[in-house]
Amino acid sequence: MKINSFLIILILLFISIKNSNGEPEKKFKLITLLAAHVQDLGFNNMVNRGHVEVSKAMKLEDSQAIVVVGYNDTIRILAPLVAVGDVDLVICSSQDHAQACRELATKYKGSSIKTQFLVRGSGEATSNLITYSYNYANANYISGYFAGLYTKTNKIGFLSPGAIDNNNDSFVYAFWYGAKRANPDISFYYYNIGNYLNPDKTVAATKDLLDMGCDMVADTLNDFSTGNTLIANNRKTAMGTSGFPQRDVYGEDVIYSYNYNWFKLFYPVAQSVYSGNTNNTNWYADFNLNETISFFGLSFSFTVPNETLTKFYEELDYLKRTPRLSHPYFCNDLMYEYAKKNHLTMSTNDSTHCLANSQFTRINAPFPGMTWLGNYEITLTEVYQSRPIQIAISSISSFFIVTVLVMMGLVVRFRKNPSIRSASPIFLNFILFGALIIYVGIIIWSSSINSASCNAQFWLVTLGFTTLIGSLVVKNVRIWLIFDNPELKLVKITNLQLVPWVGVCLVINIILMSILTSVGDLREVNAQGIDSLGKYEFMRICKMNSSGASTLYTILAYFAALLLIGVFVSWKIRIVDILEFNESKAIANTLYAISFCLFVIVPLMISPQDKQSEKIILCIAGLFIVTAAVLIIFVPKFYRVYIFGSGGTSDMFYKKKKQSPVATARAESTSKGSSGGGAGSGGATGGSGVKTNKRGNLVSGDFSDDTESSLSEPNKPVKVVAGAVLAEFTDDTISDLDNIDQPIEIITENGQDSNNNNNNEENKDNNIENNKISEEIKENLKNEENNDGDN
């Protein structure tokens, strides 16, 4: 007994030593290529499940499932892995991988690389190439048969990728023929999606089919988007036709589903490769009477009537017992005429009305009774800008348009009033007309977009700003040239001389805008992916190319140059003490308003902005800039007209106020240098009818809209007190001295003749003469203020 036990122990020990010292267990590396991620709950999920089950059954430590899409991706990823030489089997599950895998198999055939490729499709097998296929037509036929039995509305819908992967719509036909065979009264509608995996189109197309009254909708796609849409719409007729056991996930919401069992195909192939077999064959998967090797699994809801199940299984048993090439979708009364019409080849025995096996996947055109709805395209939804904001901007702009028109009328009505005449009515109306154009442009900018409005808004706004700013600048250049004239040279500047300069500004603008329009390709486009739009939403926007953008920047630089000129002119005329002409403060305030807007707008525009927000900011900024400019320039003028009446006098510009230190110092200097009141007492004190400026100098003049000239009487000498500004503004010219031919006698502020200094008697005479001149100025002012001008 002890001997027997000892012998058994020795035998077991010997076996253990033999196994431990023997050849190590053969390693096996498996790679499976997927066309999409496993989350699709469809074809790729089931392929991955087959890969995992094979790895578990064979206890593989080195197996990978890799997602690759298309030929290039397959070559790029797979070729380096195969070149290492340690990959035993590559499963190319999709037809997307087929060409690349076949090329690699051909490349390494007969080489030291022992990798074998299991490729989906047909063709001759080689020592390192195994092909496989499965009866997809059979699965679709029997699914259609169930749909025909179960439908209540007799309307069935279907979705397919369409004419891709050389499949065309042959499987749609198989589904339809199964439904037609079960229920001849059905109506059948189908869309092509264009891809095996496009959930957005699938959902939208399914909804369309439901709206048409279809209660059964199936597909040949890789996911369950169709079924999910039916479930979301409270339909209890979802069908799982993607090869995934959908009922395992959705339960009774799915009425019927079939699933692939890839393990039953992959495992025997992997075992064959593992054993070293190179005598490869083609593999084919289908329903089988032997359930242990049947590729398809079926599942039904408990709500399916027994009568329906009975008819279904009767048809399925018929398919299992009938050779595949004699199945109803190959052989029927419709096939002969269809093949003849579409140039397909029938089988050798035409009397059977069976299509040749190689011709089945060429079926694409619909059979009589199939309604093809075309290639489905999702209808994009247009997103409009906020209607209330659009109405608000348009209403405000319209109000200011009316206001500007009223102002233009008032300028014409009160053109003789010194408050208006001194600012040149023609240029005031130019400024208002520019504002009017901008307001119209803002209305177009805020309205619906088309190619015409895209161009119109840029033209109107740029021309408006050029007219407004150009007129303001040119008008004040005249004041600068007149008063920046220390030598009292003759200066003649008429409106006819100034208006062309505004025209020059406009011509430059027109040239730049013409370039933008011609080369900028400024047009309306339907933009997607902006302003947090949905995937299938769009917004109309104006778009230009890079050349147009460069031109637009040039236009902006041009506007900046005009503004800088305006700043310069404003600074230069600040010294003009005649308030009728000194608009430097108004111009400065206008420029401050524009600058304020720029400081606010530029950071906002640089930061990421929605197109709608950008449009609103630009429109509001335009309204603010133009309105501020108009109010700053015109409100003081109309206010003076209102206070002093429609006639008005030049006195409206002068207010009693404390003299500036400079003016006080000059007045004191004048008093000390004169003997008794002279020019100092008569001029600096601003006696009755005589006005003084900030410097204490005499000011006299009549102001019209377009000319400036000195006071003089024909054929008489003109005596001018040094430091006094003498100007009469008529309709013809603007000059410091009209009668240049007459002798000019200059009298200094000290009352001394420039040709005879230090003569006290002459000083007294000059002071008396200075007072006489002041009286003449006073009388002339009264006469001119009562004299209506034409402009």
Curated annotation (Swiss-Prot):
All ranges on the Extracellular side of the membrane: 23-390, 446-453, 517-550, 607-615
Record field: transmembrane: 391-411, 425-445, 454-474, 496-516, 551-571, 586-606, 616-636
Record keyword Coiled coil present: yes
Location of the protein in the cell: Membrane
InterPro entries linked: GPCR_3_C (IPR017978), mGluR/GABA-B-like (IPR051530), PnrA-like (IPR003760)
GO cellular component: G protein-coupled receptor complex; plasma membrane
Membrane topology: Multi-pass membrane protein
Segment forming the signal sequence: 1-22
Residue stretches in coiled coil: 752-781
GO molecular function: G protein-coupled receptor activity; G protein-coupled receptor binding
Ranges facing Cytoplasmic side: 412-424, 475-495, 572-585, 637-791
Listed Basic and acidic residues bias regions: 761-785
Glycosylation sites: N72, N168, N279, N290, N306, N349, N545
Ranges of biased composition (kind: Gly residues): 674-689
Gene Ontology annotations of biological process type: biological process involved in interaction with symbiont; detection of cell density; G protein-coupled receptor signaling pathway; negative regulation of asexual reproduction; polyphosphate-mediated signaling; response to bacterium
Protein keywords: Coiled coil, G-protein coupled receptor, Glycoprotein, Membrane, Receptor, Signal, Transducer, Transmembrane, Transmembrane helix
Amino acid composition bias (Low complexity), ranges on this chain: 749-760
Region (Disordered): 664-715, 746-791
Domain of life: Eukaryota
Family: In the N-terminal section; belongs to the BMP lipoprotein family.
Protein name: Metabotropic glutamate receptor-like protein D
Record gene name: grlD
